């Protein structure tokens, strides 16, 4: 059980410094259960509620604005193939969101009555060797506006029907490169609606590639034991991507991004 109490004050300097006060609170619940059989099969179920405060935006006044709330039910089964250190997970889910904030073609904001998302997820996590990890995920989502004066029955924007991720990494052991870890992956995001009215076509699906490398310095310099250097790159081919609230509100996605850093473990 969780309790959120959100309060905010907004000052409009274009309207003589008028202030708008918002107070929103909610108690949310979450629980789950899993039973592990000796044969490696583990059915599970979970329920969770969400709460997201929303502040006045555009012509959406403090009297009209409501927090976004959600309820999610998920159930599935895990299967551990111990001999191959591999876990398979399959699940189905249903999510209902109320009062979702969305942009309008007139550069304003409104709140959608209810959006229902239901679908299925599949994932595999495997360690075929002590120094090898493979991860694959796939999700199918059918999302639709179920309560809305304008867009009822339409698919919301920014929600792809299909998403797929694949990642693998390898750690060098018992070689001159001991302490070095390299990884690579691919991400696929399916087509998405451009307009909430579903009348402007779709953004095409995109495929992006990522890489990562890290090195434990202590393997080469014992006095630096605990220090790890890291570098990662997302969208290494610099694939151009887009996302849209509607046909008047679109933006370019993140270009190739490289990050470097270091960490120390005590």
Name these PLM-found stretches:
Residues 36, 43-46, 67-127, 133-139, ...:
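Membrane-embedded beta-barrel scaffold of Gram-negative outer-membrane proteins
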Residues 1-97:
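Structural signature of Gram-negative outer-membrane beta-barrels, strongest in the C-terminal barrel
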Residues 31-35, 75-79, 122-126, 136, ...:
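Residues on the lipid-exposed face of transmembrane beta-strands in outer-membrane beta-barrel proteins
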Residues 94, 111-196, 240, 263:
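Gram-negative outer-membrane beta-barrel transporters
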Residues 38-40, 81-85, 131, 173-180, ...:
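Short loop/turn motifs that connect adjacent beta-strands in outer-membrane beta-barrel proteins
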Residues 1, 43, 86-90, 134-136, ...:
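Transmembrane beta-strands of outer-membrane beta-barrel proteins
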Residues 96, 177, 187-195, 215-266:
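C-terminal beta-signal and adjacent terminal beta-strands/loops
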């Amino acid at each position: 059980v969780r309790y959120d109490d959100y309060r905010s004050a907004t000052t409009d300097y274009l309207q003589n410094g008028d202030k708008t006060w918002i107070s929103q609170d909610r108690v949310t619940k979450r629980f789950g259960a899993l039973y592990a059989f000796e044969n490696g099969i583990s059915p599970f179920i979970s329920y969770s509620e969400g709460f997201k405060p929303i502040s006045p935006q555009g012509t959406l006044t403090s009297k009209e604005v409501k927090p976004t709330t959600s309820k999610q039910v998920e159930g599935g089964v895990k299967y551990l193939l111990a001999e191959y250190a591999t876990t398979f997970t399959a699940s189905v889910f249903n999510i209902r969101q109320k009062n979702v904030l969305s942009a309008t073609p007139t550069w304003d904001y409104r709140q959608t009555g209810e959006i229902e998302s239901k679908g299925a997820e599949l994932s595999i996590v495997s360690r075929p060797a002590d120094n090898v990890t493979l991860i694959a995920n796939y999700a199918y989502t059918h999302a639709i506006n179920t309560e809305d004066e304008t867009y009822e029955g339409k698919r919301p924007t920014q929600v792809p029907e299909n998403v797929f991720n694949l990642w693998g990494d390898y750690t060098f052991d018992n070689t001159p490169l001991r302490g070095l870890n390299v990884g690579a992956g691919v991400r696929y995001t399916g087509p998405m609606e451009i307009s909430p009215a579903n009348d402007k076509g779709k953004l095409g699906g995109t495929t992006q590639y990522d890489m990562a490398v890290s090195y434990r310095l202590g393997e080469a310099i014992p006095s630096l034991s605990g220090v790890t250097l890291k570098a990662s790159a997302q969208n290494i081919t610099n694939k151009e991507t887009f996302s849209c609230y509607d046909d008047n509100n679109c933006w370019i996605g993140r270009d190739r991004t490289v990050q470097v850093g270091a960490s120390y473990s005590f």
